């Protein structure tokens, strides 16, 4: 018996590498492919890519040349300057021969005899419905930015024979569809007899193909391998393909082809093999349909898992269903173990995974395939949200290689926190633009716009500077900013729904910002955005708050001075969205390729979508289009944000998702332009409305390390970390960051006479929830003022929202007590409820040495000693599933007296669990406070040595 050239090479290679179980092996040569000489036969434009029906050359009988037809899918962005990664997609066997490439690609109707009603089109649809959850995987990959090639293997599709095609058509037509089969004169019995006879001839035909090839020193598997290598050669010849990043994917028989191709073709960078890996003894039990995959002489030398000696160290992913009846798990596990043996020196390059399901490529498996190919052909991926914390209404600008973001801060200060990134995924806090919040001078000549009936200029109905320092203005203040870089300076424009529109600017976003400049006094103006257009004009768009203005769902524009400090005319309505875009708001104003665009969310914060308005004139009229919606994804909303263009010409959109107790977390979406409209996210169905991505390739930007907004604080600096915010404009009397001691001291702040609960405390020092699950631990030392006759000082750790829970230390006539307190519906003035209480000991502080200088000429008064109580506090937050896509959040508390032994807070015989709620337009926060409730000209204090967050 003569061996094929491939098997001879394999055997020689095995002999040369005898005894080796891992490392680098000689890969046998399989010959050079002919010039592909591609011809384009037909073209169809599809959403985001082009489908070409092509013909190219492979090696035929006796070294002759054979022309093979294929589908070539090309993303719209592909060009000689923007080269895209490529994937060769290899179809399965399936005992279905009438289609091959059409098992992966939606057929091009123009080349089918009967168009979209053709038998091939129906067969293709039937196959993807059965095996791919209705998805043409090649088309999906093209929409994700891959050049994709899919060709027929020998004996499939356009390379099959009439008997095989007819048998496939009859065999896969069910009783209802039988009338659609090519021979409609057959009744059911005749159909069965015909199928049986055809089946025999089809299998005889497969054996004949194998024998004919073997007689020429070629086995069928080698023929397919050579054809697949020729397909790779075609991809390499295309000027818009990134030839360093070509991968392969195959399902079932296609997986066999994939790992053979990856082993013997250096031009394939990585491979994904789905549902074809087993042991020889299992393969021997399978049917005669395996002629196309049989490598008979090799069985005396190696098992299938030994292909790993030729694959390693090439990146490979092997997947198999837990309940795959063709490839039972116990056999596949043996093969996977052998593969891993050969990858022992490069273990990270091989992944073997089992998934729930059988011999099937469902959508979850498809996502794993795309993730793996992206990781190896496009680079690493990011996961949304990129900032899993409450940065509401984010906006972004680029300056050089850096990206800057700010967001709403409402009543929390320092406000307008500034974040910076170099890759749009890893962000760090660098500063804040608002440290104080003076309002506009209501008596000056600043223009007054009245939207609310009955509102007079001398009665602004807005909290003044005093109220902003003494009472938390929950949900008021700093709404939906826009950040821009213009003429060498950073500008932030922001709307206060009760006072008007203001602007702050700086040349250094990490440094000090100028005091606010108020452009207009108004009741209800929100969400402003400036634009300096290409004609040298400046504009300001904004929305309005129905709660203040008495109307919503309308957008405005006003001309602005070139320096951005004042409006040149009153605002006018340019768009009314009541009928089609209700609750439209959050304007972001841009000029792009000669047109004006307003990006605005509509439909509500947690339930809406992204709308874009387009016009040739700033004043309109504006066309409208929904460009991103939830579309069944886990990202509800998706809400307000801004888009950015990178230096390399990529477009990205940052927006928030309302996650209830966790606040409004930040997502990064890919964006592209199609026919003058942006498409945000991934548009799988081609309707122009994108779906938010949860995982996607990293932007084409330099990676400078993993970064995230700060959270833990050791209090070793003379100022608070940038993550901290107060519930109101802070007083310098509230705290002292003592770097010499490495601690933060909070003084007990006198609360107002009408104080009801912590919702009324302006001196809460808090930060955002940093993740869905995290643990906060802090060491608190409490020193109440012994001079206070009414013992009422308290300090503690709080998880704060419209309801809150706090573990705290309280001074009382009986001494210091540790209490667990909750307040449900604190925003409605509800009283606190104690759920746990116990006494704790105190240590007297030494008498200060300075006492020796006190006068003794008057009757001496012995000073009351200060005492200190130290307790470790801990809060553990976790997400819990509930109906819908946004999890609920719960928190438990514990305490320790030595930092080692921890005691859970117990209430009613079980561990206390608090159901976390968001605040007013914000997520829940966690932090510290120190209060007193009776007047005195001095205070006690608490000290925190550190505040540590772990995930």
Segments the model singles out, each with a brief description of its role:
Residues 33-82:
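N-terminal cap/lid segment of alpha/beta-hydrolase-fold proteins
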Residues 70, 82-94:
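Short beta-strand element of the alpha/beta-hydrolase
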Residues 92-226, 236, 283-285:
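Cap/lid segment of the alpha/beta-hydrolase catalytic domain
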Residues 202-218, 227-231, 267-308, 313, ...:
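Mobile cap/lid helix-loop segments that gate and shape the active-site cleft of serine hydrolases
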Residues 241-250:
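Alpha/beta-hydrolase fold nucleophile elbow
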Residues 311, 318-320:
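Short beta-strand/loop motif that positions the catalytic acidic residue
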Residues 337, 343-379:
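C-terminal catalytic histidine-bearing segment of alpha/beta-hydrolase fold enzymes
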Residues 380-951:
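Carbohydrate-active catalytic/glycan-binding domains of CAZyme proteins
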């Amino acid at each position: 018996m003569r061996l094929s050239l491939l098997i001879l090479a394999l055997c020689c290679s095995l002999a040369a590498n005898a005894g080796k179980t891992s490392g680098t092996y000689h890969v046998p040569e399989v010959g050079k492919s002919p010039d592909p000489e591609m011809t384009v036969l037909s073209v169809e434009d599809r959403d985001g890519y082009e489908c070409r029906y092509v013909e190219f050359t492979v090696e035929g009988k006796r070294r002759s040349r054979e022309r093979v037809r294929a589908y070539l899918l090309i993303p719209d962005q592909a060009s000689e300057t923007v080269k895209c990664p490529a994937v060769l997609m290899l179809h399965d066997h399936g005992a279905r021969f009438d289609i091959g490439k059409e098992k992966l690609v939606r057929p091009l109707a123009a080349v089918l005899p009967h168009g979209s009603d053709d038998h091939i089109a129906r067969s293709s649809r039937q196959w993807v419905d059965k095996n791919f959850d209705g998805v043409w995987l090649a088309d999906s990959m093209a929409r994700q930015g891959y050049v994709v090639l899919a060709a027929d293997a020998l004996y499939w599709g356009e390379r099959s024979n009439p008997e095989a095609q007819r048998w496939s058509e009859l065999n896969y037509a069910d009783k209802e569809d039988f009338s659609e089969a090519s021979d409609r004169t057959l009744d059911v019995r005749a159909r069965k007899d015909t199928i049986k006879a055809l089946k025999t001839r089809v299998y005889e035909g497969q054996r004949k193909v194998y024998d004919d090839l073997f007689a020429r020193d070629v086995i069928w598997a080698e023929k397919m391998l050579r054809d697949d290598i020729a397909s790779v050669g075609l991809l390499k010849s295309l000027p818009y393909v990134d030839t360093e990043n070509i991968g392969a994917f195959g399902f079932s028989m296609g997986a066999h082809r994939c790992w053979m191709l990856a082993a013997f073709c250096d031009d394939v960078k990585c491979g994904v093999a789905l549902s074809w890996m087993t042991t020889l003894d299992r393969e021997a039990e399978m049917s005669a349909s395996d002629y196309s995959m049989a490598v008979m002489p090799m069985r005396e030398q190696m098992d299938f898992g030994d292909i790993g000696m030729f694959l390693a160290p090439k990146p490979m992913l092997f997947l198999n269903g837990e309940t795959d009846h063709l490839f039972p798990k116990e056999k596949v596990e043996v093969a996977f173990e052998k593969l891993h043996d050969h990858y022992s020196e490069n273990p990270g390059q091989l992944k073997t995974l089992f998934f729930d399901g059988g011999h099937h490529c469902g959508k979850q498996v498809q996502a794993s395939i795309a993730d793996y190919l992206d990781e190896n052909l496009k680079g690493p991926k990011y996961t949304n949200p990129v900032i899993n914390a409450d940065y509401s209404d984010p906006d972004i600008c680029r300056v050089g290689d850096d990206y800057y973001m700010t967001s709403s801060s409402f009543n929390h200060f320092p406000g307008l926190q500034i974040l910076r990134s170099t890759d749009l995924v890893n962000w760090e806090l660098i500063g804040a633009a608002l440290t104080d919040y003076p309002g506009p001078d209501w008596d000056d000549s600043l223009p007054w716009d009245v939207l609310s009936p009955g509102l007079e200029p001398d009665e602004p109905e807005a909290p003044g500077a005093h109220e902003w320092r003494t009472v938390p203005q929950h949900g008021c203040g700093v709404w939906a900013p826009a950040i821009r870089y213009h003429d060498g300076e950073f500008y932030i424009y922001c709307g206060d729904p009760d006072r008007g529109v203001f602007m702050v600017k700086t040349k250094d976003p990490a440094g000090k910002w100028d005091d606010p400049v108020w452009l207009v006094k108004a009741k209800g103006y929100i969400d402003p955005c400036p634009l300096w257009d290409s004609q040298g004009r400046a504009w300001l768009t904004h929305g309005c708050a129905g709660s203040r203005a008495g109307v919503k769902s309308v957008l405005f524009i006003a001309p602005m001075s070139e320096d951005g400090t004042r409006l040149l005319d009153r605002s006018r309505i340019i768009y009314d969205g009541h009928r089609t875009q209700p609750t439209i708001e959050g304007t972001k104003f841009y000029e792009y390729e000669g047109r004006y665009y307003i990006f605005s969310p509509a439909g509500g914060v947690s339930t809406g979508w992204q709308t874009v308005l387009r016009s040739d004139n700033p004043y309109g009229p504006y066309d409208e289009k929904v460009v991103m919606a939830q579309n069944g994804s886990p990202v509800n909303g998706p809400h307000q944000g801004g888009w950015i263009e990178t230096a390399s010409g990529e477009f990205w959109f940052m927006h928030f998702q309302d996650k209830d107790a966790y606040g409004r977390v930040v997502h990064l979406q890919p964006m592209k332009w199609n026919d003058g409209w942006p498409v945000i996210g991934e548009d799988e169905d081609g309707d122009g409305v994108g779906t938010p991505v949860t995982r996607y390739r990293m932007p084409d930007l330099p990676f400078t390390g993993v970064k995230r907004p700060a959270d833990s604080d050791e209090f070793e600096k003379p100022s608070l970390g940038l993550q901290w915010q107060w519930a109101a404009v802070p007083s310098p009397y509230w705290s002292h960051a003592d770097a010499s001691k490495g601690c933060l001291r909070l003084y007990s702040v006198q609360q107002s006479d009408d104080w009801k609960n912590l919702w009324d405390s302006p001196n809460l020092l808090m930060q955002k929830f940093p993740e869905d699950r995290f643990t906060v631990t802090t060491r608190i030392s409490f020193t109440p003022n012994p001079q206070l006759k009414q013992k009422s000082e308290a300090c503690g750790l709080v998880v704060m929202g419209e309801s809150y829970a706090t573990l705290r230390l309280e001074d009382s006539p009986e001494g210091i007590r540790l209490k667990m307190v909750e307040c449900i519906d604190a925003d409605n003035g509800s009283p606190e409820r104690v759920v746990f209480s116990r006494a704790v000991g105190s240590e007297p502080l030494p008498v200060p040495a300075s006492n020796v200088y006190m006068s003794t000429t008057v009757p001496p008064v012995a000073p009351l000693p200060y005492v200190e109580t130290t307790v470790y506090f801990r809060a553990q937050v976790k997400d819990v599933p509930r109906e819908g896509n946004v999890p609920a959040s719960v928190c438990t508390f514990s305490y320790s007296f030595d930092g080692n032994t921890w005691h859970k807070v117990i209430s009613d015989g079980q561990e206390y669990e608090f159901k976390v709620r968001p605040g007013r337009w914000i997520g829940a926060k966690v932090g510290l406070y120190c209060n007193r409730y009776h007047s005195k000209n001095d205070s006690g204090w608490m000290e925190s040595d550190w505040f540590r967050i772990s995930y």
